[in-house]
Each structure stands twice: as C-alpha cells, then as structure tokens.
C-alpha cells in the first residue's frame, strides 16, 4: 500500500512542479522537493520511503486543494488517506497493528496507473 501511495502522489507532485504552479509559495516548493527527493529517487530504499509516508500524507492533506487532480482522482486520494489513517489507528493489545501492505497495493495500483497515463 505504502509504495503505491507514494508513487501515486509522486506523479501528481511531479506534474504540478513541472507546470510551474509551485513558484508562488516557497514552503510548498520546498516541501514538494523534499517529497520528490525521497519518493522520486529510485535509489532510496523502501524503509526510508515508509518512514517518510506520514510526511507525504501530511503534505497531501495540507496542499490537496492546490494539486491538479480530477474529481475522481481527488476522491480516490481522499479515500486512500482515510484508509491509511484508519489502518494506522487500529490497535492490537494497545499497540498499532503491523503489516497489511498487500491490501494497499491492490487498492492503489489502478490509481497509480491512471495517473501515469
């Protein structure tokens, strides 16, 4: 799940930065470049990307209105964020649950492919 989310948002960020819309807000530009440095670099390991996933979700929540998404893509991204939050809020014996990446891959793969096209 996490990897697919990362690549989906990464593609959106790349498109947005490439369009030049980020130049008006230096904080947005800086954060977007940080996200791209982590998630856009194929040499960054999966653990590092997983560790930075909360920052990516926070970035999306803060700047989602500025990202050029279709209504369908925005609804899908919001559902993914909601599911991510729900999964992280699940607790087993008072400790956050581990795993669950397979479901996320299945949910996000079509979205990642649609953005890429």
UniProtKB/Swiss-Prot annotation:
InterPro entries, A to Z: Turandot
Domain of life, per lineage: Eukaryota
GO biological process: cellular response to heat; cellular response to UV; innate immune response; response to bacterium; response to heat; response to UV; response to virus
Major localization class: secreted
Disulfide bonds: none
Location relative to the cell: Secreted
Keywords: Immunity, Innate immunity, Secreted, Signal
Keyword Glycosyltransferase: no
GO CC term (a single one): extracellular space
Signal peptide boundaries: 1-22
Pfam families from the UniProt entry: Turandot (PF07240)
Record keyword Plastid present: no
Family of the protein in this entry: Belongs to the Turandot family.
Functional description taken from the UniProt entry: A humoral factor that may play a role in stress tolerance.
Protein name: Protein Turandot F
Source organism of the structure: Drosophila sechellia (Fruit fly)
């Amino acid at each position: 799940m996490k990897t697919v989310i990362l690549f989906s948002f990464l593609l959106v960020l790349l498109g947005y930065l490439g369009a030049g819309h980020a130049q008006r807000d230096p904080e947005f530009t800086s954060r977007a470049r940080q996200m791209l440095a982590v998630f856009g670099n194929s040499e960054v390991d999966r653990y590092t990307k997983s560790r930075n996933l909360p920052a990516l979700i926070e970035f999306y929540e803060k700047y989602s209105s500025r990202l050029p998404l279709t209504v369908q893509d925005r609804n899908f991204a919001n559902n993914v964020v909601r599911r991510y939050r729900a999964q992280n809020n699940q607790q087993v014996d008072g400790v956050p649950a581990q795993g669950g990446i397979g479901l996320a891959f299945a949910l996000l793969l079509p979205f990642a492919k649609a953005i890429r096209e």
